Amino acid sequence: EDTEDIKSKNTEDTEKTDTADTEDADKTEDTKDKTTVASGIVCWGDDLINGEESNTYSYMTVLQKLLTDNGYNMTVINKTLQGGGTLSMMKMAGVSDETIQSYITKHQQAANGAQLNVTETGIRDLTEEQTTRNDMDCIPVIFMGYYGGWNHDPAELADQQEQILNTFQNKDQFIVVGTRPMDGSVTSE
């Protein structure tokens, strides 16, 4: 190759690199525009500690202390129900009655007339305060399933968790904590 061809080729390569860098920068700016800053963290499910000890030892209290101690200005919101099943959690999150009823019907059909735990077909009476959503722009932590409501089917539990996640504006950041059910019907074995 002669000198002119090399110069021409180098100029083309530089232009391609500059164009690629500009496109990458544009993509980064687009991503920045789409990313929303979470106003806090919201805990859904159960804290597994009852009474006064919950105020000191629940994972929400510990999480709030860790955030504060490490300089994060994020509030941890408590949307847990002591002893609440997943159906009640979905109701509290605003999942449609039709969707919740489809789970109940499925549970009743699977039971084939056998007696079910109340959390498999029952939904708690919830107060307006419990169903009011002040957490839509928060990062959800979902820790549910211990008390039932998912017919001992881990795939159904995952689907119910997703139903709650779908009620949030930003679905890019979340934590799902797994727990085995209180009755021991599903284990990791």
Q: What role is predicted for each listed range?
A:
Residues 2-3, 13-18, 22-94:
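Serine-esterase "nucleophile elbow" of acetyl-processing enzymes
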Residues 12, 23, 39, 83-84, ...:
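Feature targets compositionally biased, intrinsically disordered low-complexity regions
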Residues 65, 100-189:
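Alpha-helical cap/lid subdomain in secreted, periplasmic
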Residues 77-117:
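Acidic/histidine-rich helix-loop elements
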